[in-house]
């Protein structure tokens, strides 16, 4: 079998012969971890601080290969933002930041992530911005678990690890709180989520929260307000909080189209959760009756675009 960098060969049967006077912790490994486990147990009985590498060299090698694959994927994703999707994603991201003055020197920004494609892209764009910007600012990648299923929680954590995004997760019981609300549970859920995010961001010393709403979200919100609310309202690129003094909400994806986000996702063969809400655990493809008002608006825009692609 192969070797692990920094390791030294040893005759298991002869140990502890050859060990230094004060060896400290001894980590043993063999091909599959069986012999090293037995040897570690024997050494512990003799008073040594010994342990065995779980799964042996082969398991270690597999973990290393997976890590290399993850590093290669992360590098490919980042290169796609710098090259193939530079104009549609990166340039529109930085344009919104300049045009609406969303990021300023010494800002501490909580990049709020739901685990979907939009917020994960936003996180990667902020990482790029930190690499290339000429002024200092800091970022917290914040994930609120409002009651996700274990499967969705695992997907979020694995994607963050895969894309090298150091997330901070905190929990709330929002899904349970709105589960029995009959009228506008989604609206109430959104308001409660934002309040929790503001509160946690402020606790972490942030002065801004960044949300992953894109250009299409803005259009859909205007139409939803007109058709279902009888009023004209929209999402602004930035808002000062009225309930959390000194806090500001920014939307740096304001000029990015959703189709471009989907192209980036599919080009890199990435897979994210969609709506992880308990109301939509049976997704709309399985249960069309669960389709939301926003989905109705999306469908309407899709039909209109066939008549006028512009």
Roles of regions detected by a PLM:
Residues 1-27, 31-79:
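Rhodanese-like catalytic fold shared by cysteine-dependent sulfurtransferases
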Residues 5-6, 24-26, 207-208, 247-251:
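Short active-site oxyanion
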Residues 9, 52, 141, 169-171, ...:
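A structural preference for short, hydrophobic beta-strand core positions in alpha/beta folds
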Residues 47-48, 165, 270:
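Short phosphate-binding/catalytic loops that engage adenosine nucleotides
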Residues 69-224, 228-232, 236, 259-263, ...:
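ATP-dependent adenylation/nucleotidyltransferase module used to activate substrates
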Residues 139, 217-297:
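Catalytic subdomain that performs nucleotidyl-dependent activation
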Residues 296-310:
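An accessory alpha-helical subdomain
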């Amino acid at each position: 079998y192969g070797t692990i960098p920094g390791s030294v060969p040893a005759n298991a049967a002869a140990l502890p012969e050859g060990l230094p006077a004060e060896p400290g912790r001894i980590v043993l490994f063999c091909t599959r971890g069986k012999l090293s486990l037995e040897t570690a147990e024997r050494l512990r009985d003799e008073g040594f601080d010994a342990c065995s590498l779980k799964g042996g060299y082969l398991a270690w090698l597999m973990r290393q290969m997976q890590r290399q694959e993850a590093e290669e994927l992360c590098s490919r994703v980042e290169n796609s933002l710098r090259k193939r999707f530079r104009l549609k994603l990166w340039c529109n991201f930085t344009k919104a930041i300049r045009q609406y003055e969303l990021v300023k020197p010494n800002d501490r920004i909580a990049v709020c992530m739901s685990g979907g494609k939009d917020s994960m892209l936003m996180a990667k764009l902020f990482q790029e911005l930190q690499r290339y910007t000429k002024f200092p600012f800091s970022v917290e990648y914040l994930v609120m678990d409002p009651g996700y299923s274990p499967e969705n929680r695992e997907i979020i954590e694995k994607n963050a690890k895969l894309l090298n995004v150091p997330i901070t997760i905190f929990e709330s019981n929002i899904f349970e709180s709105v589960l029995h609300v009959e009228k506008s549970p989604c609206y109430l859920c959104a308001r409660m989520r934002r309040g929790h995010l503001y509160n946690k961001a402020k606790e972490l010393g942030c002065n801004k929260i960044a949300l992953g709403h894109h250009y299409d979200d803005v259009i859909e919100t205007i139409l939803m307000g007109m058709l279902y609310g009888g009023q004209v309202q929209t999402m602004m690129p930035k808002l000062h909080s009225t309930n959390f003094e000194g806090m500001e909400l920014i939307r740096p994806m304001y000029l990015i189209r959703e189709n471009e986000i989907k192209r980036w996702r599919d080009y890199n063969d990435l897979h994210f959760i969609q709506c992880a809400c308990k109301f939509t655990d049976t997704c709309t493809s399985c249960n069309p009756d669960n389709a939301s008002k926003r989905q109705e608006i999306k469908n309407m825009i899709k039909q209109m675009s066939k008549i006028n692609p512009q």
